[in-house]
Amino acid sequence: MAAPIRAFVLRVLSDSTRNIHHVLRCRSKYLCRRAAITARRGYSDSTEGRSTHFGFQTVPEEEKAEKVYKVFESVAKKYDVMNDAMSLGIHRLWKDTLLHIMNPQPGLRLLDTAGGTGDISFRFLEYTRSMYDRQQRLRAKSQQTPSWKDIAGHYVSDEEGPPQSRAVVCDINKEMLKVGKQRAEDAGITTGLSWVAGDAEELPFDDDQFDMYTIAFGIRNVTHIEQALQEAFRVLKPGGRFMCLEFSKVTNPLLARLYDAYSFQMIPVLGEVIAGDWKSYQYLVESIRKFPDQEIFKEMIEDAGFFRVQYFNLTGGIVAIHSGFKL
């Protein structure tokens, strides 16, 4: 009797030792990745005198948020026009691709962080509305000779109305929100949409509130990317999905050279001609080059707690869509 008990105890101790070693290895890998990410971001992890990048400049951390705010305050009224001019309209296809990968179902709640002028939220509401209409058409086709029970159920569902999808646009910049609200009014979007002034690093929402979280062309402007990712994880419901559309590292060397030439020589000029603001668009170009590449950003998302993290390169890696789930 003693021998089996002794064998059982030894096995438990052995398993516990292996688990401890596994945790220590994971922790070591995490710290190594964090050190690499910190170095890439260009600021110290010490608590005093921390600095970060603002484009190619090195600035104190507390100054970056203010500088970024002023950039978007300056470009807000011409932001959408400049997006079309800079990308030759391709940004619309990138955003449509984000929605198709996301494939949101009717009735879900979206947090569109750094949502600015509402592009992603408008697409989300239109997509879920179209999805609901398609589901209704398929349902009607499958009921060519409905029973009285089906007819009664149809009347009940009509009274209840379609499931209401909701999008919350959260942006730290009030000028961007003002432009977005005007766009929504002009487009006749009156339901399912709300606007909140808030910081991606300290979201003004309770835990487990949203089914989906998107941030499009915004996370590279955040001072502490890890903190923004942790906030995304916090406000998502279990099973919720994180999606980020952001400029990334071009994978083709020839395209990379052409892209660099276009970015640095043409985009600031367009900014001056269209928006009367060279410096803001010079910063935007530089901020793209300072953002982590696809693999490093994927690791950052995993470190925030997300699972099944993957990314999709678009237009040769000029932009990438990262996706992850909160389990």
Swiss-Prot record:
Catalytic activity annotation: a 2-methoxy-6-(all-trans-polyprenyl)benzene-1,4-diol + S-adenosyl-L-methionine = a 5-methoxy-2-methyl-3-(all-trans-polyprenyl)benzene-1,4-diol + S-adenosyl-L-homocysteine + H(+)
The keyword Thylakoid appears for this protein: no
Keywords carried by this UniProt record: Membrane, Methyltransferase, Mitochondrion, Mitochondrion inner membrane, S-adenosyl-L-methionine, Transferase, Transit peptide, Ubiquinone biosynthesis
Any one Gene Ontology BP term: ubiquinone biosynthetic process
Molecular-function GO terms, alphabetical: 2-methoxy-6-polyprenyl-1,4-benzoquinol methyltransferase activity
Pathway the protein takes part in: Cofactor biosynthesis; ubiquinone biosynthesis
Cellular localisation: Mitochondrion inner membrane
Binding annotation for S-adenosyl-L-methionine: 117, 171, 199-200
Principal cellular location given in the protein's record: mitochondrion
EC number: 2.1.1.201
Membrane-topology descriptor: Peripheral membrane protein
Coiled-coil intervals: none
Keyword Methyltransferase included in the entry's annotation: yes
Gene Ontology, cellular component aspect: extrinsic component of mitochondrial inner membrane
Family annotation (InterPro entries): SAM-dependent_MTases_sf, UbiE/COQ5_MeTrFase, UbiE/COQ5_MeTrFase_CS
Family according to the record: Belongs to the class I-like SAM-binding methyltransferase superfamily. MenG/UbiE family.
Main function: Methyltransferase required for the conversion of 2-polyprenyl-6-methoxy-1,4-benzoquinol (DDMQH2) to 2-polyprenyl-3-methyl-6-methoxy-1,4-benzoquinol (DMQH2).
Subunit structure: Component of a multi-subunit COQ enzyme complex, composed of at least coq3, coq4, coq5, coq6, coq7 and coq9.
Entry protein name: 2-methoxy-6-polyprenyl-1,4-benzoquinol methylase, mitochondrial
Organism (species): Danio rerio (Zebrafish)
